[in-house]
Amino acid sequence: MEHHSILRVISKLLIPPIILYALYVQWHGDYGPGGGFQAGVVFAVAFILYSLVYGVDALTRIVSPRLLHAFAGIGVLIYAGTGVVTMLLGDAFLGYNALAHDPVHAQEWGIIVVEFGVGVTVASVMMTIFIAFASHNPPLKDEDW
């Protein structure tokens, strides 16, 4: 898509607000609809859009599959680690009340940390799945349309 300058400009204009919206959904998730899963998908969509315009190779130069696998594992560790910490502090798995002296603050912090782990994992896995499928197909040429 070297000569599709309109797509390139529009994608450069859209990708930053998409990432910003993903961050909003992530950090607003404990107050309303949203959270880690939704934010992870929206965050991955920004990178998938980049890949659709510039190619899968351009995406893998920015975010390597190895890094995506690491982030997927880190997200799961954040989620599970939060549960283990609450158990070590004497509460149930993901019993957030053990995280702070005030139950309201403990619930907020627990949800934020767990949703962050979910968001990291979902974004990484979505991009990994996209790269796996997109890299096996021959690229479409403009002449084929």
Regions found by a protein language model. Name each.
Residues 55-60, 83-98, 128:
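Transmembrane alpha-helix boundary signature
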Residues 5-7, 42-66:
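Cytoplasmic juxtamembrane interface segments
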Residues 69-85:
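Hydrophobic alpha-helical membrane-insertion segments
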Residues 30-43:
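Short, non-helical or kinked segments that cap or interrupt transmembrane helices
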Residues 12-29:
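Short, hydrophobic/aliphatic alpha-helical segments
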Residues 101-116:
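Short aromatic-rich membrane-water interface segments that cap or initiate transmembrane helices
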Residues 134-145:
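Cytoplasmic juxtamembrane regions at transmembrane-helix boundaries
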Residues 45-51, 114-128:
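Hydrophobic cores of alpha-helical transmembrane segments in multi-pass inner/ER membrane proteins
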